[in-house]
Amino acid sequence: MHFYFNVLNLLTVWVMMAQLQQGVPDEKEKTTALKDLLSRIDLDELMKKDEPPLEFPDTLEGFEYSFNEKGQLRHAKTGEPFVFNYREDLHRWNQKRYEALGEIITKHVYGLLEKECHLKKVTLPVDATENEPKSFIFMSEDALTNPDKLLVLIHGNGVVRAGQWARRLIINEDLDSGTQIPYIKKATEEGYGVIVLNPNENYIEVEKTKAQVQLSSDSSDEPAEKRERKDKIQKETKKRRDFYEKYRNPQKEKETMQMYIRDNGSPEEHAIYVWDHFISQSAAENVFFVAHSYGGLAFVELMIQRETEVKNKVTAVALTDSVHNVWHQEAGKTIREWMRENCCNWVSSSEPLDTSVESMLPDCPRVSAGTERHELTSWKSFPSIFKFFSEAMEAKNSSVKPAPTRRSNRIKYEEL
């Protein structure tokens, strides 16, 4: 890694010496001189010698890691936690290694949902053809038939998939804090049916063929002369980009295209689809949601699109550091009123768990999750959330509105 930086420094000195010998050239001459010098070095080969191949194991055993009895990821030989900087000064390679491990973690969690939590995988769309892109969710056997209670879990956005709250926590902390497994097990013990959404599984990536790459650049109705000028500019731009890529990405990766999953192309679409085809069809008299971060936004969008159905079916909603915004999402007055009575948002805060946290928005009450770390809010608020659900159901059965938490000084909002 240090070698090619030294080469670049040497090239800079050469250019400066050339300037001193020839006087002060204009910008065009400087650029020409530098390009000429750099063109004599095969940067592709230089970087490939420095960066190891982007080839990683596809199993935990291959990485020499496993989860111990406490659910912590540990090295099989040393017993040490995961080390990100496996190779000094190779951040990109280390990041790719981390991402490869993350994909294995995702599959591992899927396995735990089926084996330990006894959930079943259900394919989406429900009428998917053999060749179209597909997604899936996880459900307990009684998810649609349980007459009493149903728990629905929605994680945030990013790389996390069904069953996860935060990949970072799974790798660096443990399975309990980073996955939804404690929620699923607790819900099962207390007689809930369970549905685990998978809102980030929106598309599959396939490698582009040469014909598709060519088509994407040729598909234009512009006049030939204009297209030629445009092509020339694009070629020059590509040449400069490729020149830079030799530094940033010496091992050129394959060009891919995204094929979106029908009716599940975004977290919001996914939530509505699962509601329409599963949750709304369930027998449960009381449906409860736990939605983390962007999952809260997806729930609010669901409520906007299916307001009457949600009000009739959902008993309470626990949000954890939700990023929803009732103004930006244009949630109506009746939705905001319902959220104030039936939702609670456990937010990252330095205050003790369940302490009231002031909010400027006229939506659901906010209380502390007992942690300042966003990704830990679902885990730290875990016991309070199930208590909130129990109180909500008791209040519904006795026709008395529940207090969102055990706090005092409930925030009063003025309608604007």
Curated annotation (Swiss-Prot):
Basic and acidic residues: compositionally biased ranges: 223-236
Main subcellular location of this protein, as a coarse class: nucleus
Keywords for the protein's UniProt record, in alphabetical order: Cytoplasm, Glycoprotein, mRNA processing, mRNA splicing, Nucleus, Signal
Ranges where the record places region Disordered: 211-248
Localization, UniProt: Nucleus; Cytoplasm
Database matches in SUPFAM superfamilies: alpha/beta-Hydrolases (SSF53474)
Residues linked to a glycan: 397
Signal sequence annotation: 1-23
Pfam families recorded: Arb2
InterPro entries in UniProt: AB_hydrolase_fold, Arb2, Arb2_dom
Catalytic residue list: 293
Record GO biological process: mRNA processing; neural crest cell development; regulation of alternative mRNA splicing, via spliceosome; regulatory ncRNA-mediated heterochromatin formation; RNA splicing
One GO CC term, this protein: nucleus
Family of this protein: Belongs to the ARB2A family.
Functional description taken from the UniProt entry: May play role in the regulation of alternative splicing. May have hydrolase activity.
Record's protein name: Cotranscriptional regulator ARB2A homolog
